[in-house]
Design a protein with these regions (language model features):
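PDZ domains - specifically the beta-sandwich core and the conserved carboxylate-binding loop
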Residues: 213-215
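Alpha/beta enzyme core
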Residues: 3-211, 220-239, 243
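C-terminal helical cap(s) of enzyme catalytic domains, especially alpha/beta-barrels
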Residues: 236-237, 247-257
């Protein structure tokens, strides 16, 4: 939803058909397939017993103008449970004006999901225009994303999804929050694995699993980029990665690879 159907599927229109998304996940050996109520609901009767379904509860609908950093619920936990999903996912835009409301909504949804025996996955993303300073984008800073992960596990997410960190020192550069210099000198270095390990530490030292984003497709480097993300994540103590546009914005056989 956040990337819009046209922009997402124009490179490979077969994925306008939800069944092909599920087939890609199955043939690619994925542990689960995460998508919308509409996509998974349209094929649930045929596929919910063949691969675990993760239904995304909320989205940025991206058709309001001007667009805002917000997430709206598209359905309920009970709907996801009724279609045979084993887990629900949700996004909170930490740092945005609406993040407090999103926290309350998703905490309540996750509580009910656990009552039904479902797992919960939280997309712990940052969204604030002031998180960019000059040429540096601190939306992927280890200290900021680590704290977002910490908030996510506090509302009992079983898995957190986060961007792979590319820098550090967001709190200091932006000039807010609380810091201890040892966050930057002892708990992390500039090495990508150490930056990711700081994210893992904020997930109760790995008690809550960390998966990193696959990111947008860059063409011929996609496989290499995915391997790097997976290796960094696993060596840092994470649980892997989630692939989307890197997989379905190319022919099925290449996506499976």
């Amino acid at each position: 939803i956040e990337h819009t159907a046209g922009a997402s599927f124009a490179p490979n229109p077969i994925y306008f058909d939800p069944e092909n998304i599920v087939k890609l996940a199955i043939e690619g050996g994925c542990n689960a397939v995460a998508s919308t109520f509409g996509i998974l609901g349209s094929v649930a009767r045929k596929y919910a017993h063949k691969i675990p379904f993760v239904v995304k509860l909320n989205h940025n609908e991206l058709l309001s103008y001007p667009n805002s950093f917000d997430q709206v619920l598209f359905g309920t936990v009970k709907e996801a449970w009724n279609m045979g999903a084993v887990a629900v996912g949700a996004t909170i835009y930490f740092g945005s004006e609406q993040s407090r409301r999103q926290l309350v909504e998703i905490a309540e949804a996750f509580e009910y999901a656990h009552e039904l025996g479902m797992a919960t996955i939280l997309w712990c993303y940052l969204r604030n225009n002031d998180f960019k300073k000059g040429a540096i984008d601190y939306h992927s800073a280890a200290d900021l994303t680590g704290q977002a992960d910490r908030l996510g596990v506090t509302i009992k997410a079983d898995i957190v999804k986060q961007k792979l960190p590319t820098n550090n020192g967001g709190f200091k550069a932006i000039g807010f929050g609380k810091v201890d210099e040892r966050m930057y000198t002892e708990l992390a270095t500039d090495h990508p694995i150490d930056l990711c390990r700081y994210q893992v530490a904020n997930g109760y030292m790995g008690r809550v699993g960390l998966i990193n984003s696959g990111g947008e497709s860059h063409g011929t480097s996609d496989l290499r980029d995915a391997v790097i993300t997976a290796v960094v994540n696993k060596r840092a103590g994470g649980m892997g990665l989630i692939s989307g546009r890197k997989a379905f914005q190319k022919p099925m056989n290449k996506g499976v690879e």
